[in-house]
Amino acid sequence: MLSGVWFLSVLTVAGILQTESRKTAKDICKIRCLCEEKENVLNINCENKGFTTVSLLQPPQYRIYQLFLNGNLLTRLYPNEFVNYSNAVTLHLGNNGLQEIRPGAFSGLKTLKRLHLNNNKLEVLREDTFLGLESLEYLQADYNYISTIEAGAFSKLNKLKVLILNDNLLLSLPSNVFRFVLLTHLDLRGNRLKVMPFAGVLEHIGGIMEIQLEENPWNCTCDLLPLKAWLDTITVFVGEIVCETPFRLHGKDVTQLTRQDLCPRKSASGDSSQRSSHSDTHVQRLTPTTNPALNPTRAPKASRPPKMRNRPTPRVTVSKDRQSFGPIMVYQTKSPVALTCPSSCVCTSQSSDNGLNVNCQERKFTNISDLQPKPTSPKKLYLTGNYLQTVYKNDLLEYSSLDLLHLGNNRIAVIQEGAFTNLTSLRRLYLNGNYLEVLYPSMFDGLQSLQYLYLEYNVIKEIKPLTFDALINLQLLFLNNNLLRSLPDNIFGGTALTRLNLRNNHFSHLPVKGVLDQLPAFIQIDLQENPWDCTCDIMGLKDWTEHANSPVIINEVTCESPAKHAGEILKFLGREAICPENPNLSDGTILSMNHNTDTPRSLSVSPSSYPELHTEVPLSVLILGLLVVFILSVCFGAGLFVFVLKRRKGVPNVPRNATNLDVSSFQLQYGSYNTETNDKADGHVYNYIPPPVGQMCQNPIYMQKEGDPVAYYRNLQDFSYGNLEEKKEEPATLAYTISATELLEKQATPREPELLYQNIAERVKELPSAGLVHYNFCTLPKRQFAPSYESRRQNQDRINKTVLYGTPRKCFVGQSKPDHPLLQAKPQSEPDYLEVLEKQTAISQL
C-alpha cells in the first residue's frame, strides 16, 4: 500500500514538472520571442530585443531548437553563459557588437552544430574560445576585425567542416592551425593574406572541396610558389587569386601564371624553365600591358578571365528552365533563391551571397542587351572579346549588384552619358583594348565605389577636366599605351590614387603644379617609354621626383631629346646640363606631397599599397662604373710606371769613392789660340772657358768653403799677360792653355806630351820649350775637402751649371822662362765688364 502511494506521488511530480516545462516554453515564445516549429525543430527568434545577457532567457529543456539572437547588445560572453542551452543545435549571435568571448562561454553546448558570429567586433580567436563545442560542424565569423588566430583555436573542433573567415584582417595563418580539423569548405576572401605556405597550412587541408581566396593582396613572387604548386595539383573549386604585387603582375590570376612569371631568377636556375606552348600563349594574352612590342594604339585580343576549376560535385545545379540554386545548400541559413543565367554564357555562383559570376566572353555579342534572360544578382560579368561598339544608357540598368565588369578587347568607341549610373557597387571596371578617344566626366557618373579602372591600349588623345572627380575611391588607374600628350589641371584632385600608369604615351613633359602635386606621396607611378624632352621644361618633373616626399617611380624617366641627352636617365643629369641658361628654374613651388591626404575621406589602404623602396643599382650603371674604375686604374698604373722610369734616368752614376775624388778625374785638353784674334780683350788670357768644380789652384781664394759643394772664385784682382804692344810687333806666337773641362768637343792637334803637375811643389821642373812657344798653366792642388755623396747627388744639376757658366775671378799664369824677353814685364789690368757680360750671354745660349 505504501509503495503504491509512493509510485503515484512520483508520477504526479513528473507530470507537474512536464507541465511547468511546457508552460515556461510557451511563455517564452509568447512574451519575449517568436517561436515557430519547422520539421520538428523549434526556431526561437529573439532578434533585436535589446538583450544584454542570455541569462534572462529560460530555454526549453526537452526540445531541440535553433536560437536567433541577432541584433542584440551582447558585447561580451562570460563563462557558462550558455550552460543551460544543451538542446540548441544552431546559435546566431550576429550583429551584436561582440568584442570578447571569455573562456568557457560555450560550455554546455554539447549538441551545437552551427555557430554564427558574423558582423561583430572580434579581434582574436584564442585556443580556449571554442571550448565545449565538440559537435560543431559550421563556424561563421566573417565581417569581424580578426587579425590573430592562435594555433590551437580549432584543435578541439574535430567535426568542423565549414569555416568562413572572409572580410577580416588576417595577415597570415599560424602553423598547424588546421591540423586537427577535416575542412571541406574554407572561405578566406577579403583578408590581407599575401602568401600561404604549404608546410603547416595547406598540407592539412587535403580533403578540401572548395576554397575561396579572392580579394587578398597576393604577393606574386617566389614566396607564392608553394601555393602555386598546390593549386596545380588539386582538382577542387578555387576562386580567382589575383596578384596585387609586384606591379608588373598586378591584376593577373595566379592560376594562369607560370613559375617563371612568379620567380624569374629561381626558375631560370632550375628545371622549371620549361613551359608548354599552351601556357605561354595564354599568359601572353593575359598580360597585354607588359608587352612592349605591341602597337600602342591598339591592343591584341585580351585574355579570358581565369576559368574556374572543375569541382568533384556540381557547383550550380541548372534545370531546364535555367534556374539554379546556390552552393552548400546544407549549410545555408536562408532559403535558396532561384538563379537565372543568360543563354550562351556560363555561370557560377558565389557561396556567401548567392551572387553569380557570368562568363560571356567571345560569344559574338554586339550589344549588352542581347544577354537574355537577365542574370540574377550578378557579381561579375565578363564580356571580353565580343563585338560591342557602344555602351548604351539602359544596357546595365539591371546589373546594380555588379562588383566587376569586364568590357575589355571589344570595339567600344562610344559610352553614352549615364551608362554606369546604376553601378553603385562596382569596384573594378575594365575598358582596355577598345577604341575610346576622349574621356569626359559624365562617362563615369555613378561609379563612386570604383577602385580599379583599366583604360590601357585605347586611342585616348584627350582627357577632359574633372573627368575623375566623381571617382573618390579610385586607387588604380591604367592609362598606358594611349596617345596622350598632356593632362588637364586638377585631373587627379578628387581621387585617392595609389597606382598610376602613364607608360608609352606621347608625353614630352608633365607640369607639376595642378597635376603631379595632386597625387599622394605614396603613389607608384610609371612614366617610362615616353618621348621626354630633357630641356628647361622638364625641370619641374625632375624636382618632383627628387623631392623628399617623392613617389615611387616604376622604371626611370629616360630622355629622348635633345640629341645630346638621348638615352640618358633624367635623375642622373645635372641641372646645368638640362638648362644651362637657368639651372635654378623649376615648375613652380613643389607643394606638399600629402596634399590630398588632408581631405577627409574614409579610405582603407592595405599595407601592400605602400611602395617598397628598392636600392638596387641597375646593371648598366654598375657595368659602366666598373669600366670607369678599370680605365682609371690602368691610367694610374701607366703614369706611375713612367714616373719611376724618369726618376731612374735622372739619377747620375756617382762613383763609390766619390769622397776621394781628385783632379785626376778631370780630362785635360790642349787648345791653341792666337793672341791677336780678339782686339777688345787682348789682355784676357781666357776665352771664357769655365772652370771645373774642383779646386784648380792652391791659392786659398780658390778653396771651397766647408759645407759648400759648389766652387766659386774671388774677385779678379791680378791678371798676368804679356805686353800687348810688344805682342803686336812680334809674329804670331803659339801658346797652349791647359784646362780641365768636360764639354769641349774640339780636340787639340797631336803634340809631344808635356808634363803637367798636380802639386805646387813640382813647379821647379821645367817644361820642354820650342823656341817662342811657351805654356800657360794652372797648378791643380789636391783637394782638401770633398763633398759627401749625398750633397753631390742633391746639387748635381747646380754643380754642372756652375762648371759650364761660372764666372772666373782670378787665375795665375806661370812663366815659361825667366829670361824670355816678352814675359819679363808683369803688367796688370782689370777685365772689361761688357766683354765678360757678352761672353756669359754667348755661353748661356750654347
Swiss-Prot record:
InterPro entries per UniProt: Cys-rich_flank_reg_C, Leu-rich_rpt, Leu-rich_rpt_typical-subtyp, LRR_dom_sf, LRRNT
Residue numbers on the Cytoplasmic membrane side: 644-846
Keywords: Cell membrane, Cell projection, Disulfide bond, Glycoprotein, Leucine-rich repeat, Membrane, Phosphoprotein, Repeat, Signal, Transmembrane, Transmembrane helix
LRR repeat feature ranges: 63-84, 87-108, 111-132, 135-156, 159-180, 182-203, 377-398, 401-422, 425-446, 449-470, 473-494, 496-517
Glycosylated residues, chain numbering: 84, 219, 422
Signal sequence interval, chain numbering: 1-21
PROSITE patterns named in the record: LRR
Domain LRRCT: 216-265, 530-581
TM segment ranges: 623-643
GO CC list: dendrite; GABA-ergic synapse; glutamatergic synapse; membrane; plasma membrane; postsynaptic membrane
Membrane topology of this protein: Single-pass type I membrane protein
Residue ranges of domain LRRNT in the record: 332-374
UniProt GO BP: axonogenesis; positive regulation of synapse assembly; regulation of presynapse assembly; synaptic membrane adhesion
Subcellular location, principal: membrane
Localization in the cell: Membrane; Cell membrane; Cell projection, Dendrite
Region (Disordered) location: 261-322
Disruption outcome: Conditional knockout of the gene causes impaired long-term memory and abnormal gait. Excitatory neuronal development is abnormal in the mutant animals as evidenced by a reduction of excitatory synaptic puncta in the hippocampus. Hippocampal CA1 pyramidal cell-targeted knockout of the gene results in impaired synapse maintenance and abnormal retention of spatial reference memory.
UniProt-annotated stretches for the region Required for interaction with PTPRD: 167-215
Protein name: SLIT and NTRK-like protein 2
Native source species: Mus musculus
Lineage: Eukaryota, Metazoa, Chordata, Craniata, Vertebrata
